[in-house]
Amino acid sequence: GRFSDLLTELNIPFPKFGIAESAEEATLLADSLDFPLLVRPSYVLGGQGMKIVINKQELEEHVINLLKSIPGNKLLIDHYLDGAIEAEADAICDADGNVYIIGIMEHIEPCGVHSGDSNATLPPFNLGEFVMQQIKDHTEKIARALQTVGLINIQFAVKNDIVYIIEANPRASRTVPFIAKAYGEPYVNYATKVMLGHNKVTDFTFNPQLKGYAIKQPVVSIS
C-alpha cells in the first residue's frame, strides 16, 4: 500500500503484512507472513473483528466468519509481533512542518489489544531512552511526510528495542482529551487554531504539568 511505501522510503520498520479477500488468499499469505497473525477487516472502527490466529485452521475459520458478517470487505493480515509492547504518540503539526509531540503513552496489555480497550500510562513506565527517541523520530518523520496540519496519532509495537509502526491516523484521537487533562494544557484549542491557519505550532508556549503517572482506563457501558 501507499503507507507501507512511505515507511520504506522513510526507513521506518513495520510488520510484514498482506491483504486478502478470501480464505484461499489468506492461507497463501500465511506462508510468507509466518504465524502468529493479526487479522482484521478494513474500514471498521474500534477493532471490530480483530483476532490473533496461530495456525491455518484458525485463520480460515476467522476469515470465513468475517466475510460472512462483512461481505466484500478486504482483510488486513499482519505478522503479529509476539511479546511486543504497544505504545502510541499524539502530536500537533502545522503547514510549515513544525511538530510538537503532546504525549507518548505505553499500553499495559500486550500488543494486539485494541487501543480503545487497553489501559495505558502517561508517560511510559518501561520504555528506555533509545526506544523513546525512535518513537519521537518516527512521529516527526511521518507527520511531516503526510503533510499533517492539526493532530495525528501514531501507534507502535516495540520488540527487542526496535520500534515498528502499526498505524497512523492524521486526526484527533481518543487519547488527546486524556493527555490534555493530565498535563493541564488546552491541546485541542491549539490544534484547532493551527488547522484554521490562525497560528503555527511555534506560536504556543507548551508547559505540561504532571506529577507521577496518569492512567487511562477503558469505560464499558453494560445494560
Pin down the residues of each PLM region.
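A conserved helix-loop-beta module that forms one wall/lid of the active-site cleft
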Residues: 1-50
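ATP-dependent carboxylate activation and anion-phosphoryl transfer catalytic cores
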Residues: 1, 10, 33-36, 46, ...
